[in-house]
Amino acid sequence: MTTPWTVRPETPADVTGIRAVTVAAFPSQDEADLVEALRADANAWIDGLSYVAEVDGVVVGHALLTRCHVDGADALALAPCSVLPEYQRTGVGTATITALLGAARERGEGAVIILGHADYYPRFGFVPASRFGVTAGFDVPDEAFMAMPSTPGAPVPAGTVAYPPAFGV
């Protein structure tokens, strides 16, 4: 099946487009500011783990993995994920996240953590993080705080997630 979009790693030329997509996808600029703060944090940002979907050279979707830790063990935080409203429910988000998770797997990364919609993220293999003994360190609904190994069957470390400072938690 041919799609009108292509998915690829972010380049410096995408920064403005990523901000525009993120602002359009959320009710405030907070998530767009989060992306920029994470990009500026050398301890959180991982080159090659920020992916965009584009149509005719225009960024229409974005997904980001940054470094976090579970009781000191390296892990990844998936957030934020953004799609222009007119491209939502078309497969852009799924394609972008799938490619991004594949890139993490190819790099040999470990666990991936997400605080997100319980009806959406299980399609990628996410399950409640509590099944692995992973906690957020703040109150979140169990079904919305999820984890998965980037490589199926690999261990997920138990403990409390330490997010980069930009997350504010």
Write out the residue ranges for each language-model feature.
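Short amphipathic alpha-helix that is part of the acyltransferase structural core
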Residues: 1-37, 44-59, 145, 151-169
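Conserved acetyl-CoA-binding loop-helix of GNAT-fold acetyltransferases
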Residues: 83, 89-102, 114
